[in-house]
Swiss-Prot record:
Pathway: One-carbon metabolism; tetrahydrofolate interconversion. It catalyses: (6R)-5,10-methylene-5,6,7,8-tetrahydrofolate + NADP(+) = (6R)-5,10-methenyltetrahydrofolate + NADPH; (6R)-5,10-methenyltetrahydrofolate + H2O = (6R)-10-formyltetrahydrofolate + H(+). This is Bifunctional protein FolD. It holds the Pfam family THF_DHG_CYH. Its EC number is 1.5.1.5, 3.5.4.9. It comes from Dinoroseobacter shibae (strain DSM 16493 / NCIMB 14021 / DFL 12).
Length: 299
């Protein structure tokens, strides 16, 4: 068996097209332009690249992009003052603070300062609680993207056995909650799980998100399963020590011979994250104005 390769890049392009259509409708019908504000504290090179990508994609779909770059020595009080200003700004429907922030700032406190209705990263305890209780909130972008890929590949997830490896607040827990909402039977696996390989072999849906390169081997995977690889590890390239390569949590070449479908790294889950950030911003905009939520962009 050779697995179907799930093309996250192509699917994300489709999500962005839906976002752009909804942005155009909001502008032409209601005179509203969704706005996303991104705050960057310090000069982390990787963060600067991520922020630039978010700005570019935000503008490409027709939304307003508000970028705020603050010096590394910015105090908590000054950062909170900016967040309060963005919370109160009716032109801003989504707020994201790019992490990591400098060590003197507390990331949890930063997230807590953002209005949950504008927390388009879905990281606040309010949005996490809404998800856990089955209520309507804003969902963390990467789990939302994975769910979109799974729905597209499998349709109805009811009754399927799903195993999520990793229990982080950022991904694992919300991924498990989303799968429960879809009526899958969910097992949350982690570093203390006994006989992890045996647990994984039960899964119709296997989601790996622990950051250990090629941990999931072919004999961990049920034949025909759908495998979603969320892990990213950068390692020296075996053929050129001056270059690096990205590896996922799954031994891709081996598992692709067993699975029914699999996401590659890169090009699988990664592109979905920003696409879902844009989707969440449109959803937040519609909710702020009491308008119907766009089809296919929210859960």
């Amino acid at each position: 068996m050779t697995a179907e390769i799930i093309d996250g890049k192509a699917f994300a392009a489709g999500v962005r097209a839906k976002v752009a259509h909804n942005v155009e409708t909001l502008r032409d019908t209601h005179g509203i332009t969704p706005g996303l504000a991104v705050v960057l504290v310090g000069e982390d090179p990787a963060s600067e690249v991520y922020v630039a990508n978010k700005h570019r994609q935000t503008v490409e779909v027709g939304m307003a992009s508000f970028s705020h770059k603050l010096p590394a020595k910015t105090s908590e009080a000054d950062l909170f003052a900016l967040i309060d200003q963005l919370n109160a700004d009716p032109a801003v429907h989504g707020i994201l603070c790019q992490f990591p922030v400098p060590e003197h700032l507390n990331e949890r406190a930063v997230v807590a300062r953002i209005d949950p209705a504008k927390d388009v990263d879905g990281l606040s305890v309010v949005n996490a609680g809404l998800l856990a209780s089955g209520e309507r909130g804003l969902v963390s972008c990467t789990p939302l993207g994975c769910l979109m890929l799974l729905r597209d590949r499998l349709g109805d997830l009811s009754g399927l056995e799903a195993v999520v490896i990793g229990r982080s607040n950022l991904f694992g827990k919300p991924m498990g909650q989303l799968l429960l909402r879809e009526n899958a039977t969910v097992t949350m696996a982690h570093s203390r799980t006994r006989d992890l390989a045996q647990v994984c072999r039960r899964a119709d849906i296997l989601v790996a998100a622990v950051g250990r390169a090629e941990m999931v081997k072919a004999d961990w995977v049920k034949p025909g399963a759908t495998v979603i690889d969320v892990g990213i590890t950068r390692q020296p390239h075996p053929d050129d020590p001056d270059k690096t390569r990205l590896l996922g949590d799954v031994d891709f070449a081996a598992v692709a011979e067993v699975a029914g479908a699999i996401t590659p790294v890169p090009g699988g889950v990664g592109p979905m994250t920003i696409a879902c950030l844009l989707a969440n911003t449109v959803t937040a905009c519609c909710r702020a104005h009491g308008l119907p939520e766009p089809d296919g962009l929210a859960v």
